[in-house]
Amino acid sequence: MEICIVCGARPNFIKVAPLIRAIDKSEKEGHDIHCSLVYTGTETDPTLEASLFSDLELRKPDVCLGVDCENLNELTGRVMSLFEHYLSHRKTDIVVVVAALASTMAAAIVTKKQGIKLAHIAAGTRSFDISMPKEINRLVIDGLSDILFTAGMSNNFIANREGAELSKVYMVGNTLIDNLRFMHGKWQDPSPLEGLRLQEGGYMLFTLNRKALIADTEGLHAMVNAVAKAATGMPVVAPLRGLARKAVEEALEPELKGVFHIVEPVGYLEFGWLAAHAAGVITDSGNVAEEATFNGVPCLTLNDYTEHIETVKVGTNELVGEDPEKITAAIDAIRNNKWKKAQIPDRWDGRSAERILQVLVAGN
């Protein structure tokens, strides 16, 4: 059985690593199964630090398509052309894509045009905002997929409501959590590297990636200064790069700059330590919010929505948007130990990749 797994960005590798480890293990045990790992980006992508693959105990991509462009339509077309060429020269029984990037959608379209079975990890996630490119990608990928692997019952409900047959939807849990369980005891304290001398539960972790928020000068100014004021006396550790770093530095009021400790992005094991030991997490990332729920760490999501609703319903996540009053109230609640009680969502047991592999093998 030949499986092709496609990644379009750094977070994708983290989500597919457990599945690739499971497939490689099965192959070594003598089973007739093999997977190739395709990255749509370039070999020199600065977000793919060498330590990422060693940290995840994951081999590097077998093939890099080399697509690197800002225009999403151009990116989609180039990935489609190059991935079609790849598939036409390699026997493939099933293609597995993850999440909802433009590159992921491009690979999904080509897969079906080639008559190859398609599986989607993290299916059934929705923001219900069709103006967002990722929402369009999700609808297309789920609509094309032969197998939908969901992380929770709410995702199952969405997929079924949109017409997916019950027989092709599988609630397998969250592969991101498989990694967190796999990495237990392996996190590395990054504070000596930055001279921060952080204490467990004595700092806030801040991440920012959303381009629309970074570009909103007025909104960003109000948001980051609300964070800094509410967290005064407690360092806010912010691993940021590029435009996000520049925007936050410029938005902070001079008297509050000392609250934020803006550092270069850290490796996977170092970030895992920061996320697990923070008093609270402030982020616009759904993946980081999922980590916070697993770790039992309070989380403020800088959006008015989340595709990962379990983190709000039963987890530690709260949606505060960019509202300074909500942000202030939430940080006050964290500092006064008044955060809501939370639980680990169903099937966050570290066996998601195992379930996915069972389905893939059974359906071959």
Question: Which residues does each PLM region occupy?
Answer:
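Short internal beta-strands
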Residues: 35-42, 236-242
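N-terminal beta-loop-helix "entrance" segment that forms/cooperates
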Residues: 42-59
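A nucleotide-sugar donor-handling region in carbohydrate enzymes
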Residues: 42-47, 66, 144-217, 320
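Glycine-rich phosphate-binding loop signature in dinucleotide/nucleotide-binding domains
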Residues: 86-93, 198-199, 277, 363
